[in-house]
Amino acid sequence: MKQQIFRLLADLRFSIFLLLLISFCSIVGTVIEQDQSIEIYKTNYPLTNPVFGVLTWDRILLFGLDHVYRTWWFFALIFLFGLSLILCTFLQQLPSLKIARRCQFFRTTNQFYRLKISTVLNDFSFNKILGRITGSQYSIFQQKNIVYCYKGLIGRIAPILVHLSMILILVGTIVGSLFGFKAQEIVPKTENFHIQNILANGQLTVIPKTSARINDFWITYTKTKTVSQFYSDISILNKQGNEIERKTISVNHPLIHNGVYYYQTDWNLVGLRFKTMANEIIEYPLINFSENQKIWLTWISTNKSLTEGVVTIIDNLEGYCSIYNETGQFLGNIELNEIINLKQPLTLIEIISSTGLQIKTDPGIQIIYSGFFFLMLSTLISYITYSQIWIIQKEKKLFIGGTTNRAVFDFELEFFKIIK
């Protein structure tokens, strides 16, 4: 019974079926939004009008289709597929490799008739044939008048490496799903922060209690005044608040600390900071009123009832903003350290900005990379041709034949050069 189960799991057709099933589940996870709120699923997949006739929000939540890649049944499929590859490797591929390493001598001349390439040579030097085969980089094994030769045995390792690479990729995927996390933080300049706003995490994830500080944030612009790049000067702090690592990050250039990646993803303007003639600091919050554009505004009142004042609009981090009155009339621009005369003079001392960070870790990524490395290596090795040649000397005749697993035409040319 156990052997039958092992044979079923090691069967190539069963492995292909599991692979197709995993691919189908991955497609489902791509089509259905992952890790969203229940309200989104209720809106997009209503009970009264099922998508594709079957998808409703309650079924999505019931079967875990809102987090496909972290469900027990998806892990079970990956585990079965990995087990199938392991059994196939040990029960089929390794025994096949061991057989290929053995000296498979032909004992009778009738065996040559099963080969696609074979011939009989009359009055041909046996030593001359062996010399040519040696010159073609074959390994030669001889027992009196019979000879077995092969080359390219390493090419038979390619299927084993394919299995190994797929197992590593699967293991890396599971490790990343169980122990990884992704968080998003919006942090004002000069502020400290901890990882708190978790977007996704695995069942066994331990969120690091790392403290960090945004020392500075700035933006570079092109000649056409569009954003070229934005940067954050970020420091990692220890428990005592002392800096242990510091780096300026930008888009596609993250800070990496203990396997945790800090990516620059977004930016925002938080407020304007003014100083009065009495050195009193006043802050006005900025509101982004457009989802598609980076435009912020604030209301600077000139009376206690907040009924009079000016509107300040800003769309950049170049150090200036525009002033409008209650009727929308443009009054002018104000730059940093410049005074605006309202009921009392105010000096713009700072445009308070914040940086958007995506913080994530995936402990399985190195395992996945190693899996792809072995996959590429197996692809290169698979191009190495595994060829075999058999010879039997009988009286004054030489029976010689060969076979190969690929590049048949090249092998035929090589074979005819040997017997020429």
Swiss-Prot record:
It is found in: Plastid, Chloroplast thylakoid membrane. The chain crosses the membrane at residues 12-32, 71-91, 157-177. It comes from the Eukaryota. Changing residue 65 to F: In UTEX 646 / Bohlin. Keywords: Chloroplast, Cytochrome c-type biogenesis, Membrane, Plastid, Thylakoid, Transmembrane, Transmembrane helix. Belongs to the Ccs1/CcsB family. GO terms for biological process: cytochrome complex assembly. Signal peptide: none annotated. May interact with CcsA. It holds the Pfam family ResB. It is a multi-pass membrane protein. Required during biogenesis of c-type cytochromes (cytochrome c6 and cytochrome f) at the step of heme attachment. One of its GO terms (cellular component) is chloroplast thylakoid membrane. The lineage of its organism: Eukaryota, Sar, Stramenopiles, Ochrophyta, Bacillariophyta. It comes from Phaeodactylum tricornutum (strain CCAP 1055/1). This is Cytochrome c biogenesis protein Ccs1. The gene is ccs1. Coiled coil: none annotated.
